């Protein structure tokens, strides 16, 4: 099954799995999803992920979700830029999520990165989603 917006699909799968207190969730594999998950892992929002290759040639990513005292580490995850309405930000206008307690994940010319990394690299880009 193909999805029109793989990032929204990934976010929804994570949100739904955490509402059901699942320890792991699977999603179809792609480089974009793996790069987004790498940012979430480096920022401490998920435990990790693994890419699984099937005999049919399709790949799947298994995500290990993270909890603290039984509560999900990700309190809020929200898509900002959508296929019908793209949202771009220059380095000067990068949004701060809850006064710096959360992060914005951006797609920049230098790859997918968190907002503080984009500020350090002095690049702007498409604001994919925010996490708190």
Swiss-Prot record:
Q: Which domain of life is it from?
A: Bacteria
- GO MF annotation list: rRNA binding; structural constituent of ribosome
Q: rRNA-binding as a keyword? A: yes
InterPro entries listed in its UniProt record: Ribosomal_uS8, Ribosomal_uS8_CS, Ribosomal_uS8_sf
Q: Which GO terms describe its biological process?
A: translation
Keywords from the UniProt entry: Ribonucleoprotein, Ribosomal protein, RNA-binding, rRNA-binding
- Oligomer and partners: Part of the 30S ribosomal subunit. Contacts proteins S5 and S12.
Protein name as catalogued = Small ribosomal subunit protein uS8
